[in-house]
């Protein structure tokens, strides 16, 4: 039994996992907290880090490949008496006061879901257009505002609410493409969850140099569009999704031209219409963007 279970899915990033665990040490001091690490590497690359941690880490291996499978194994660690489940990613570090901020916001707003900002720290030699255009960095809101797109990178969930829904699971058809957390929290919203933003509950992530480039940002945008397109297809026909995708591309191109003409350069908000539209059309054709596929693991779909 604990007030909080912090669930961390990891895969072959022991150094980053160690940084995260160290950042959690002052946060959990004096609080009733369990920490569960689910290693999606069958050989257990995170085991030594967890055993060496000053924290009492519950470490398990989920050999089935895929981020959704690891997240579901994290759900399996929940006990009947746990009150809140908190998701953080293995490549993040929590800011001092993070846990207290989540706790205070949940109490103040009586929310079922509380999420906070993820601050992306670009490498020093990252191209200037990335930060100037708002790429990679996520939006922030005022504390108390609705949380529009919770994810497993910095989110608290009231477990009694999950129990009232008979404990929904992460959709493993999204394991290799990503997006299982988007689908999970969208289902909670559709079920009536009260989702609130807490701007003080900050985590940081260092952006690897190999991601600070146009090719990765473009592919990530299409992948995110592909995921949202697959979810949209559950409610709308393929022709409607294709037409909506084409409309988004057209709007995004026009908005990007406007941004450039006005001297703002390429802006992430405008470019996202283009990549999302491409992703929607790809989803309508049955194409998956398997960002998390592993060389020996085929992608179905």
Residue positions per predicted region:
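Conserved donor NDP-sugar-binding/catalytic core segment of glycosyltransferases
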Residues: 97-128
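A recurrent flexible, glycine/aromatic-enriched loop bordering the glycosyltransferase active site
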Residues: 139-157, 175-177
């Amino acid at each position: 039994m604990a007030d909080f279970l912090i669930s961390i899915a990891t895969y072959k990033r022991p150094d980053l996992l160690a940084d995260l665990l160290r950042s959690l040490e002052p946060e959990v001091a004096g609080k009733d907290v369990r920490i569960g690490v689910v290693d999606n590497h069958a050989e257990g690359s995170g085991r030594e880090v967890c055993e060496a941690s000053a924290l009492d880490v519950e470490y398990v291996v989920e050999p089935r490949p895929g981020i959704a499978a690891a997240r579901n194994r994290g759900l399996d660690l929940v006990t009947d008496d746990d009150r809140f489940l908190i998701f953080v990613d293995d490549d993040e570090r929590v800011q001092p006061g993070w846990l207290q901020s989540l706790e205070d916001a949940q109490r103040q707003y009586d929310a079922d879901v509380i999420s906070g900002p993820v601050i992306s720290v670009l490498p020093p030699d990252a191209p200037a257009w990335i930060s100037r255009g708002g790429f990679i960095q996520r939006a922030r809101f005022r504390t108390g505002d609705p949380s529009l797109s919770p994810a497993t990178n910095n989110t608290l969930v009231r477990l009694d609410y999950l129990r009232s829904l008979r404990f929904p699971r992460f959709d493993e058809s999204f394991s290799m493409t990503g997006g299982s957390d988007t689908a999970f929290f969208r289902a909670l919203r559709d079920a009536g969850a009260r989702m609130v933003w807490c701007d003080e509950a900050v985590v940081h992530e260092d952006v690897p140099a190999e991601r600070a480039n146009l090719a990765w940002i473009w592919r990530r945008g299409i992948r995110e569009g592909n995921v949202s397109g697959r979810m949209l297809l559950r409610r709308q026909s393929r022709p409607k999704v294709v037409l909506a995708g084409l409309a988004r591309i057209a709007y995004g191109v026009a908005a990007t031209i406007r941004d450039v003409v006005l001297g703002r350069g390429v802006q992430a908000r405008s470019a996202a219409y283009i990549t999302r539209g491409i992703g929607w059309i790809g989803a309508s054709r049955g194409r998956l963007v398997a960002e998390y596929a592993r060389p020996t693991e085929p992608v179905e779909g």
